[in-house]
Amino acid sequence: MTTDTLEKPRLSDTAQVDSQSIAPFPNSKKIYVQGSRPDIRVPMREINLSITPTEFGGEQNPPVRVYDTSGVYTDPNVKIDVRQGLPDVRSAWIAERGDTEVLQQKSSSFTQQRLHDASLDTLRFNHQRQPLKAKPRANVTQMHYARCGIITPEMEYIAIRENMSWQQAKEQGVLDQQHAGEHFGANIPDEITPEFVRSEVACGRAIIPANINHPELEPMIIGRNFLVKINGNIGNSAVTSSIEEEVAKLTWGTRWGADTIMDLSTGKNIHETREWIIRNSSVPIGTVPIYQALEKVDGVAEDLTWEIFRDTLIEQAEQGVDYFTIHAGVLLRYVPLTAKRVTGIVSRGGSIMAKWCLAHHRENFLYTHFEDICEIMKAYDVSFSLGDGLRPGSIADANDEAQFGELETLGELTKIAWKHDVQVMIEGPGHVPMHMIKENMDKQLRECGEAPFYTLGPLTTDIAPGYDHITSGIGAAMIGWYGCAMLCYVTPKEHLGLPNKDDVKEGIITYKIAAHAADLAKGHPGAQLRDNALSKARFEFRWEDQFNLGLDPDTARSYHDETLPKDSAKVAHFCSMCGPKFCSMKITQEVRDYAAEHGTDITPIAEDEVVRMIDVEAEMRKKSEEFREKGSEIYGKI
């Protein structure tokens, strides 16, 4: 037997979960909050905290619950096997609505072709489900149910998830101090109820991306009156990555807080890669279908047709993609407006459609067939992410006529989609200096009827290649505060190369910071509880609690250990920054102790005036006596 005749190992036999993605978070456990029925079990991560040291009062600190996107990967009671996919969450909910049917075969001709290609057997995900589709004349979107006055299990699940921090603060009655915030016209209630979720989806201010063919999904919501969400991008290219690497990026990204994942694969075996990703994803998956359609015509944009694109939409919808980026706003008349730009058209999808329009001198077929696309979307409950194909690629091009012209068209398309009860969010820039960001948010709300805004940053300056996660994180925090519903992460590799696992984590943590900062600035109920808990731990020198309450416990711990590696440093009442004699928090505590000992009341408001409260004359007499007792020598002997 020669090596040529040896059978390649099948991925369905060899694939393994990324071990780092299933490692438990320190001092944390997965908990589930049950809803009105046994199959509504909402996951959260509960961080257990240590007791406050006796010298600080000796009180028990209650655990802190945090929003958890990691799925069952961090549940030690669930056996993880990426070859089998994730447990089913939603199939019973979908079936009991009675408006779907099981297809006996895949509808896409491309899918059929791939299934009959024996050379792909080694790559195939073997446990494929038969696809669901809406029954004739039925509409299966969450928006349709919401407009019919129906509160779905998905909506109740989301209400429990979104309401977590507020409920926790209310129950504990501690650390519930929170600044009011400035919400710029958002309508954020004290309590998120299932009815509030329904009403926001019904009017189009929020979307629940939840394809009926993605039953593994843990429902989430995107909207300005909810917690700000973040998206992480993954995907192979013609030059790098494998299916296993992309699944590892997925599980790694959701571990650190990605609320959705976009698969932007442009390399080989896009169909098979996507199947593995969806079957192993507890978060919504988005794609840009024009990328795969372009691969089907060997990269020649002029050869694209509506028929090829339509088949691609159906292929991906039946796999379970939850939202599609569709660049239907790149109109023929807008393309010349980009000619004088510094960086022209930088969106890959936008440039593909611009080239097609110019080559045929015809209107964008995504625009002319938009209602046909809506028919497909509502048959599977795929949400629109209307793409900003003319977004600025440099701050010099920000807020120009091309960008805002497309945005106005996206507003028109939003209204068409809503006529079909199809869910919509709007994609936004890009590269925008800080003083021009709010104009983007205000115009989007006005033109698009408050449909959720989903932006890439924006990057606030162009001078920092290698640090664009920072340049964009600044803009992301600002636009999130102004009302943006979801922020698309940027990694340090932006403009330079494809991100690896470390880059994915750094991008996600950066954007979790931006999103949380926006929630704080908006005054989202309960958002400040985690900050308060960490601040209390910091003041009480509970180092392990500080690490564990942070977004990235591993990095915090490693930075601390670089200078204070011993276990004793984890209970020390100082850090490596100032040392034991200059720690401001230690000094403050000593001042409080002194005041308590001498009967002086120091309120939090008056702590900055503490020196005036202490009997200065008594202190001077005490020091004078100490000097005399030691022999009245200016320099003591050692």
Curated annotation (Swiss-Prot):
Please give the pathway this protein is involved in: Cofactor biosynthesis; thiamine diphosphate biosynthesis
Subunit text: Homodimer.
Q: Which GO terms describe its molecular function?
A: 4 iron, 4 sulfur cluster binding; carbon-carbon lyase activity; zinc ion binding
The residues that hold Zn(2+) are 431, 495
Q: How is the cofactor bound?
A: Binds 1 [4Fe-4S] cluster per subunit. The cluster is coordinated with 3 cysteines and an exchangeable S-adenosyl-L-methionine.
Annotated [4Fe-4S] cluster binding lies at 575, 578, 583
Q: What's the encoding gene here?
A: thiC
Which residues are listed for substrate binding in this entry? 233, 262, 291, 327, 347-349, 388-391, 427, 454
Q: Which GO BP terms sit in this record?
A: thiamine biosynthetic process; thiamine diphosphate biosynthetic process
Q: Which reaction does it catalyse?
A: 5-amino-1-(5-phospho-beta-D-ribosyl)imidazole + S-adenosyl-L-methionine = 4-amino-2-methyl-5-(phosphooxymethyl)pyrimidine + CO + 5'-deoxyadenosine + formate + L-methionine + 3 H(+)
Q: What does this protein do?
A: Catalyzes the synthesis of the hydroxymethylpyrimidine phosphate (HMP-P) moiety of thiamine from aminoimidazole ribotide (AIR) in a radical S-adenosyl-L-methionine (SAM)-dependent reaction.
Q: Enumerate the UniProt keywords alphabetically.
A: 4Fe-4S, Iron, Iron-sulfur, Lyase, Metal-binding, S-adenosyl-L-methionine, Thiamine biosynthesis, Zinc
Q: What is this protein called?
A: Phosphomethylpyrimidine synthase
The entry assigns this protein to a family as follows:
Belongs to the ThiC family.
Q: Which organism is it from?
A: Saccharophagus degradans (strain 2-40 / ATCC 43961 / DSM 17024)
Q: Name one GO cellular component term.
A: cytosol
EC numbers for this chain: 4.1.99.17
The cofactor(s) it depends on are: [4Fe-4S] cluster
PANTHER family linked = PHOSPHOMETHYLPYRIMIDINE SYNTHASE, CHLOROPLASTIC, THIAMINE BIOSYNTHESIS PROTEIN THIC
